Regions:
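Beta-alpha-beta core module
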Residues: 1-6, 20, 27, 66-114
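Flexible hinge/capping segments at coil-to-helix
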Residues: 1-7, 11-33, 37
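Generic preference for hydrophobic
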Residues: 9-10, 33, 58, 80, ...
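Short secondary-structure boundary segments
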Residues: 13, 40, 82-85
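Extended ligand-binding regions for polar small-molecule ligands
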Residues: 26, 106, 110-133
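Alpha-helix boundary recognition
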Residues: 29, 50, 72-73, 129
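Secondary-structure junction motif
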Residues: 31-53, 117-121, 125
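Short beta-strand-to-loop elements that line the ligand-binding cleft
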Residues: 35, 54-67
Length: 133
């Protein structure tokens, strides 16, 4: 498992931004953005955008990556998400470019020990522990 995930912006492949290796904040200031709904995540993005956050064109709020991807593919906005959140999109429909300066998120998986689990939960824990070895 990765130690951290990178934040990216979803872009239509014919958009001029799609030709860039990474996207800087100044390139998003006039774009309609699709942001995650969770306040903790918005707070991280607010820190990244700094004083410009209050002036952003936030067109949609969505925690559903597929919905945000469909909106982006139809020219309705630029979703900001964790890299790979919509990794099954073909690159001829939607590409992802990392934000610069880099912004990352650390993920934590936790579970209670010494309680009965379903077979599916036991298998998931087994898979997670395989990465720790």
């Amino acid at each position: 498992m990765k130690d951290s995930d990178h934040w990216v912006v979803g872009i239509c492949p014919d958009d001029p931004l799609a030709g860039k290796k990474y996207i800087e904040k100044k390139e998003l200031l006039d774009k309609p953005l699709i942001l995650p709904e969770r306040m903790g995540v918005q707070s991280e993005l607010a820190n990244w955008f700094g004083k410009d956050f209050s002036n952003l064109d936030i067109s949609f709020i969505s925690d559903l990556g597929t919905n945000a991807g469909v909106m982006a593919a139809n020219g309705l906005g630029y979703p900001i998400s964790i890299e790979g959140a919509v990794k099954y999109w073909r690159e001829d429909i939607l590409v992802q470019r990392r934000l610069y300066p880099e912004i990352t998120a650390n993920c934590v998986i936790a579970w209670r020990r010494n309680i009965p689990y379903s077979q599916a939960v036991n298998k998931m824990i087994e898979e997670i522990n395989a990465f720790r070895a």
